[in-house]
């Protein structure tokens, strides 16, 4: 498998550092608010990376932290009249609700910053002893950026460029504007812990260095997060961990791209900010997950409700095909005929294509293209009378369903019972249109009655009325079947 390594700015062959074992650390949320679709994207990306590595047979240990002490948490807690701990616990709980809906597997280890204060103090002391950090008279501790020669190697920034925009704020006791806080002296009303430098709390960058070093020996295989974390957060993590240990921190640095709204970065100030809950009020969770896979994980992803509706059509098409294929396999008699070799070759090409796409920097969009190839092929087999009644057609359908199930488990989609999913989707789409199911079923029944009475003019009127509502009716031997357009 080739993965893009931000550290070296190129795709590289991924080979675990320790045999079959893969250690992966991803930065988690700062628990002060509901998760937005940017969090959903990052979580889905690393969920699929873990799933795919396990699918390949690797023994993966996945660590994803929770930042449960931070300026944002303290400020929000003060605004709402709760403690920082209460606020963080509330939003960690809400995080799990959202992630479970999106079919995101729990990480193996989910450390919280406040449970690792001794490790953070120890790391800070080591950096001071090695002259990479210094304590100020007021009890802050800063990392000496210029003491670490490789600073900037992840983000490609150099000290001179950083220096030009750096300023020491009034009241700060930095020796250099570039230095960043490892430990912050306590302020009135803030949570704090005892340390050699007095009461205080850890800086954000220190937290991830200390927690990743606790659970993994350096270097570990993969460190991940959103593109916005590469600088300064991940750059500072590298500086801290490598200055303290003299070892490389992580072999691969993997970053997912931004979610954009109309080609602009999502932000509350621009009024284009959507939480996961905002989306799931209108769409099924699997539709959102599917949408997040339609673009390569490193590319910007342009979000819109229109794009989600297109994703909804795609996912409905797949589940409908899975349902039809499963029903077609319920035949009891099959002719001995085989399928043409070129049809079998199409299946093999799709199987190879899916594997090649995933091996090439986890190209989920390309992989899903090959899944649609199989779905189209399943439909073609059903349309060709001699194929759909043959053992060759039956075996091809079985193989296609097995491939879709196997690949769906890796991508976390297409794994539900199709009939159940499509029924839920129908109700979800109706609710979004503001139409009650009872109203639709009443009209469908009235149309059936008109047809029974050979009142075709009335039947057509009702059909047109349903189409106006966005509902299509098909007449089948089993009766009228309606769907949302």
Curated annotation (Swiss-Prot):
Catalytic activity entry: tRNA(Cys) + L-cysteine + ATP = L-cysteinyl-tRNA(Cys) + AMP + diphosphate
Note accompanying the cofactor annotation: Binds 1 zinc ion per subunit.
Subcellular location(s) of the protein: Cytoplasm
Record GO terms (molecular function): ATP binding; cysteine-tRNA ligase activity; zinc ion binding
Keywords, alphabetical: Aminoacyl-tRNA synthetase, ATP-binding, Cytoplasm, Ligase, Metal-binding, Nucleotide-binding, Protein biosynthesis, Zinc
Gene3D superfamilies, alphabetized: Cysteine-tRNA ligase, C-terminal anti-codon recognition domain, HUPs
Placement of sequence motif 'KMSKS' region: 265-269
Binding-site positions, ATP: 268
A Pfam family per the record: tRNA-synt_1e
Main location: cytoplasm
Cellular component GO terms held in the UniProt record: cytosol
InterPro entries (alphabetical): Cys-tRNA-ligase, Cys-tRNA-synt_Ia_DALR, Cys-tRNA/MSH_ligase, CysS_C, Rossmann-like_a/b/a_fold, tRNA-synt_1_cat_dom, tRNAsynth_Ia_anticodon-bd
Family affiliation: Belongs to the class-I aminoacyl-tRNA synthetase family.
UniProt subunit comment: Monomer.
PANTHER family: CYSTEINE--TRNA LIGASE, CYTOPLASMIC, CYSTEINYL-TRNA SYNTHETASE
Protein name according to UniProt: Cysteine--tRNA ligase
Organism, as annotated: Maridesulfovibrio salexigens (strain ATCC 14822 / DSM 2638 / NCIMB 8403 / VKM B-1763) (Desulfovibrio salexigens)
